[in-house]
């Protein structure tokens, strides 16, 4: 909660910027968003590199197996029966850094906890995540700058990977969903910790909770890593209380009126800040220790597997 922002690069448009949900002071700073577009470009570049390495026509042989979109040459997709998302094979993803519990724990490849968030199972998976990132991330970066948003994105992605590794140990996992849910969690905690500056509190809260609920519900479908979503969301939720705190509404005006001096931050903002820092440090530390000790989260929580896939008459998990 420093008095001055360290993010000077890309700072623009100091002045009022109308927002339906909250009231802004005339001196509030807005940044040009460049990090989120750069992350999108990086993810696209990584996907192209993965498809180049995959080289489906060279590896797929036999009359009953055919690469999808063969006109793309070595960039063509695996057969739909193998990958319905129009992407590479599981072996290629594993080779390129997918999250795989045994390799992380027994082969000491902890870097996979971060590398997996730059990989995607297919073009549908990639486009869905990147469109969501643009929709969510650009607004946050414009309001809070690239340093804070970048930290939330990376640390939330790590948190999602850790929780996924603790509960899903028989499959590989890829995607930026954990980081995306971290941004959603940060948006929710930002709303709560900056509650006094919001003009349309109920509308903002209901809209955000609806988006979060729908996405978490979709995570209960088969082949979706909802543990990465939950881990990323919880990490981002705590980080929002730490990194996205705004001064109280009217604090700037009170600085020139000594008879009505107002504290820059409320007491509840300080409390949420401290509690969130403690939860983050303790939670990530305990989770990492459990992971590298080879613990299986399902043994400690018998019902938790329903959070990632809920069986119905239409599908099995």
Curated annotation (Swiss-Prot):
GO cellular component: Golgi apparatus; Golgi membrane; plasmodesma
GO molecular function, one term: serine-type endopeptidase activity
Disulfide topology: none
Positions of the catalytic residues: 177 (nucleophile), 229 (charge relay system)
Assigned keywords, A-Z: Golgi apparatus, Hydrolase, Membrane, Protease, Serine protease, Transmembrane, Transmembrane helix
Membrane-spanning segments: 33-53, 118-138, 149-169, 172-192, 202-222, 224-244, 272-292
InterPro entries, A to Z: Peptidase_S54_rhomboid-like (IPR002610), Peptidase_S54_rhomboid_dom (IPR022764), Rhomboid-like_sf (IPR035952)
Biological process (GO), any one: proteolysis
A Pfam family it matches: Rhomboid
The reaction(s) this protein catalyses: Cleaves type-1 transmembrane domains using a catalytic dyad composed of serine and histidine that are contributed by different transmembrane domains
Subcellular location as annotated: Golgi apparatus membrane
Superkingdom, natural source: Eukaryota
Entry EC number(s): 3.4.21.105
Signal peptide positions (record): none
Biological role: Rhomboid-type serine protease that catalyzes intramembrane proteolysis. Can cleave the Drosophila proteins Spitz and Keren. May function in pollen elongation.
Family: Belongs to the peptidase S54 family.
Name under which the protein is recorded: RHOMBOID-like protein 2
Organism the protein comes from: Arabidopsis thaliana (Mouse-ear cress)
Gene that produces this protein: RBL2
